Amino acid sequence: MKRRAHSLFRGISRTSRNIIKLCFLCVFSLSSLMIQAQDNQRISVDLREETLESVLWYLQNRTKFIFMYATEDIANITDISVRAKDKTITEILDECLEGTNLTYEISGSAIVIKKRKTDKITISGWIRDTSGEALPGATVSVRGSKQGAIAGLDGHYTFSIPAQEGLILTYSFIGMEKKTVKYTGKRTINVTLNNSSNTEIDEVVVTGYQNIQRRDLVGSITTVKAKDIIMPSYTTIDQMLQGRVAGMVVTNTSSRVGTAPKIQIRGTSTLLGNQDPLWVVDGIIQEDPLELDATSLMTNDLKNIIGNQISWLNPADIESISILKDASATAIYGSKASNGVIEITTKKNTTDRLSVNYTSNFIIGTRPNYDQFNYMNSKERVLFSQEAFNWGTPYSAEPIKQMYTYEGLLNMYLSHDISSEEFLAQRNVLETQNTDWFKLLTRRAFSHNHNLSVSGGTNKYSYSASMGYSKSEGQEIGNDSERMTGRLAITIRPVQKLTINAAINGSVNTNKGFAGGVNPLGYATTTNRSIDPDVYYQMKASYPYNEGVRSLSYNFINERENSGSKSASSYLSASLDLKWNILDWLTYQFTGGYSDNNSTNEAWESERTFYIAENYRGYDFNSVSPASKEFKAALLPFGGELFTNNTHQYSYNIQNKLQFSKAFNDENRLNALIGMELRSTTNKGINNTVWGYVPDRGEVITSPTTLQAFEPITGSQNSGWGILQRIYDGGWRKVNTTDNFFSVFATLAYSFKNRYVINANVRNDASNRFGQDTNHRIDPTYSFGFSWRASEERFMRKYVGWITNLNFRGTYGIQGNALTRLSPDLILNQGTVADLYNRYQSTISQIPNPTLSWERTKSWNFGIDLELFNLFNMNLEYYTRRSNAIVELDLPYEYGISSMKRNGGIIHNRGIEYTLTFTPIQKRDYALSVSLNASKNWNEGGHTDIEVKASDFLNGRSDIILKQGYPLSSFWSSSFAGLNGQT
């Protein structure tokens, strides 16, 4: 049936109908004008990091438009930043929705937000650094949306998104520069990220066992780049660390070139154990210096040169150094890390084209001179001695009569051995002598260093090789050092998920210096300038087998020319690192290393030296006849003394680690590691002292005086003749020890919402060195830490955005320390045949102590990290440590030994550290940074049941004295009660 249409204007007159139509036309025209006016309305917007829904509500409240959308379509779109001035609504919406899968339609006063109808595309690829290493946890995101992916442990990523025009991808990783890539239709996109010069929060920290983002660590760790501390005047990295890290004290103990400095981190935690930090290179622990049997000729300088743990390492091969200071950072290294850990990371191979690099430098130092010191000249020195005599200042002993010192000259005059004319004439000679000891004994130091490196490779393999040579002529004449280093490293990636790194390192070192009693710089700074350098003046001396010896002739230049020391060492190591990315979140890593270290050392004093005359002869060289009584009382009438040391140390280190790393989103991350480590170190050495050594006659050995021919002068002491037996037996000693270690460890780091971080570490070292109690054989070390990054809170970013980083952290942990050559059992030294019994003899070295246990240190650490305007960076830390130290207890002589070691001392350390860095210029290729650091450590003894005798305070044993409430290594003296009025 056909429907009939009804007119709306039926029943109305034509005139009325025309009026109504005209009204409708006016209303429609007015409505169109209003809609066009709204669309052309211009507004200003300034919003940062808001959700899309918040932006739409903001626009709706400031315009006449109503927005309609499905909540699920816009729920995941956040971090919208819009900054517009006098722009239309369409311009603002275009900017807000750019890079998303959303579009909009305007219908009257309504704006509808809806999804685009597009097909999906899948994008995948690899994210690596410049050396070709995978960047697990790196993110790729679509600009303007939450879409994207997180790279797995092998650096691979994949995700699907709706196809759209102008798609822009952003790749980022902590410590790396962000990279943006415009999508051009290519479904596989591989990206290489460059290192960033950004602030500390963006760093990746190398702890030795793992690499982890700075923001996920709670412990006290300072990382420095090797390129920032390289100084041409230093040849080893330990010297370059001086003054660079708060809480770490680097002390140069000698002016001799090649000598390792003493390094101490956060005070002293042990009295009798090793106080040096643990050195780790590419995750492999470097063994302690070789233990030597020091003699009078074996100076500490030479021992430090021999025993430097990283003397083989060329600073040019180093990428970065991490200093681990608190328990949270060091607990993973167990019983060897109570003094802190210094972790060195060497440079990685790059996948660039062939590159050849050569660097060299030449350094000329200054020679010391008297203008630098407020020292007296000869005339002032003579005047001072004259005034001291006139004031009646007593001498500690009668001056030796001689013409070469004012005191000796005056004694001769007062004894009427010379006339007044002779006295005045010689005094004038002394006043005008002005010997320049600095000119005679020192020189301008000169050194030159050369480094050559070659590197290159592809994505499948890469390689690098380097050689270094350095030579240093020390400030003291006669002190020289020379070193050659070499390194070869290769990286192979046979498949995408497997990376193999192998390296070989080698070095050769030689050093020439002085015997024990020869110190040119010390002599120059303390010796009277009125002394003629060519004369042999009389120096106080004694000889036990001739009571008439009061002095012997001494000349420093003669002493230097007829004695000396030299050392030569070689080092070779090989390492293998295999990393297998089993899953995107799971990696297995094997690390193995082997090292071989050999050294040969000599120190000697010839028969022409004061040292031999005083200790073995009793008279000056060639000053008596063979028939004289002085000759017959000499232990060593001919020849000098030669000390030799040959050592061989080899060790291996095997680690197996399984690492879990999962980023659940941009804000939550979990890192976990479990592993085991097996280490073994073998030390072999021979120390030998030979008497009768004549270096200037073909290095022959002459025979000492026989026991039958030895005739001490009447009235002299007759004890100590056993030195003849030692001379004939020789000082031969052999060392052959092997130390094995087995450890298991685990770490955990969880970051929640990029604001709350929890760290936990545990390690268990087993040893049968400590007691029969099984609880003492195991040393579990553990730590816990928590941090709150307040700057990531929304209210902080909104109201105080100029605070770019604010982090509060605290840690607690327990560390252990195992003293070497210490046992709970009875130790006997098996000696040679005793003449009295004609049987082998043994002596007690250590009595049993079944309760002996590890030294343990409990540590608290609190820190604040603050960064302002991306320019100022401040770190403030406070720590406190309590150590249960092993001390030495004196024993009655009936025990057969004078002392024993036992647990019983408490050491307290507390301190504050402060670092301020200002970086006004920070570009990709260059930066300007100024840094200031300061620290203060207080230590004192706690409760101890060990009694300290008065003699211990006054005889120079301050390094082992532990007195409650007083600092360690204090200077002690008797209190002055005043003058006795009765006397």
What are these regions (language model features)?
Residues 1-487, 492, 499-501, 505-507, ...:
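Short, small/polar-rich motifs associated with maturation and membrane association
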Residues 200, 215, 275-276, 281, ...:
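Surface-exposed loop/interface segments of Gram-negative outer-membrane beta-barrel transport/assembly proteins
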Residues 59, 96, 786-796:
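Metallo-beta-lactamase
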Residues 298-300, 575, 594-596, 866:
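Alpha-helical support elements that line or immediately flank enzyme active sites
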Residues 127, 193, 578, 660, ...:
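Hydrophobic beta-strand positions in extracellular immunoglobulin-like domains
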Residues 76, 108, 144, 185, ...:
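Residue-level recognition of beta-strand termini and adjacent short loop/turns
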Residues 346, 358, 452-456, 486-492, ...:
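Residues on the lipid-exposed face of transmembrane beta-strands in outer-membrane beta-barrel proteins
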Residues 301-303, 737-762, 769-770, 774, ...:
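Hydrophobic, well-ordered secondary-structure scaffolds
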